[in-house]
Amino acid sequence: MVPFIFGRHHQVMRITLIHNPDAGDDQSPSGDELVGLIHRAGHAVAYQSSKDENWRSRLEESCDIVAVAGGDGIVGQVAKHLIDRHIPIAAIPMGTANNVARTLGLTNKTIPQIIAGWKERLLVNFDAGLASGPWDSKCFIEGLGMGLFTETMYRLDARDNVDLAHLNDSEEKVVSVLQILKERLRTFTPNKLKITLDGQDLSGQYILLEVMNISYVGPNLCLAPHAHPGDGLLDIVFVSADEQDKLSMCLADSIDGKLARPALTVRKGQRLQIEWDGFTVHIDDEVWPDNASAFPLSPNLIDITVKRHTLQFLVSP
């Protein structure tokens, strides 16, 4: 990603801060502390908790930057609301995985360092995916997928994440989900999928299919190391039954804290079409459908394309 500068350095910036107060741990700054850090960096700030029912209305107010403090869930919600509005987004990573912030190179910096870096006004362009199907149309920031990861998300959500409730540390939660994925992989039955990518038929039996806008999915799992969120292309990860061992090794490396560079099949493209016949799909961190009976199980087409440079994110120097 090649950063570019916006605005003039000497101007005081007006920051709208959207904060998820449930994100982070005991060491994470509170809302008041975040406001103080932003003030001390020389900016004006308007605070909004994402727990307020009408928090989205704050995004209609004029500002120079929308800062988002929390995890990928709230970052994605804000980003989808700002598509095509050309308002820069500043991510403050305080979640479990922080995949978007990791993509932007922010997870190796402290929160005060990230906020201090805003004065440089460095932006990068960021694509969004668009998935049209039985749910109408939805944009995604991280990715869309089906198979092992999606089914595991669905099971965890159905149990209200009780398998992770005893864990307070974000890193422990990430490792626990990776271990659950690795265990489920041993007995997972591949899905038969009818797929075309830019007109090429790639139908087959797949353990996992992930349509990725960034390199990471879920628990910091790097499946598409060469994904670039501003190149106008999607990275589609195909894991067939024959590649089960490769995915298992990737999960094992991630559990051990190694920088996984999986030798999985990844294809780049602009348009993917999948015939949906009732299997579970995830769109970013949401599992669809909530109620399978809401849609007919006769085949429906999922059409996935790219909206190029529809968002801008701040990065640190």
Spans of model-derived segments:
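ATP/NTP phosphate-donor binding region
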Residues: 2-69, 76, 80, 112-119
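Catalytic core of DAGKc-family lipid kinases
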Residues: 18, 41, 48, 87-88, ...
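Cofactor-binding loop segments of dinucleotide-utilizing enzymes, especially the Rossmann-like FAD-
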Residues: 20-22, 50, 94, 239-241, ...
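Short N-terminal binding/cap micro-motifs at the start of the first secondary-structure element
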Residues: 24-28, 218-219, 311-313
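Short amphipathic alpha-helical segments
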Residues: 29-31, 78-82, 102-104, 154, ...
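Short conserved active-site loop signatures built around small residues
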Residues: 72, 209
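Glycine-rich phosphate/pyrophosphate-binding beta-alpha loops
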Residues: 145, 149, 210-224, 287
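ATP/nucleoside-binding phosphotransfer catalytic cores, i.e., glycine-rich phosphate-binding loops
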Residues: 197-198, 203, 222-223, 228-317
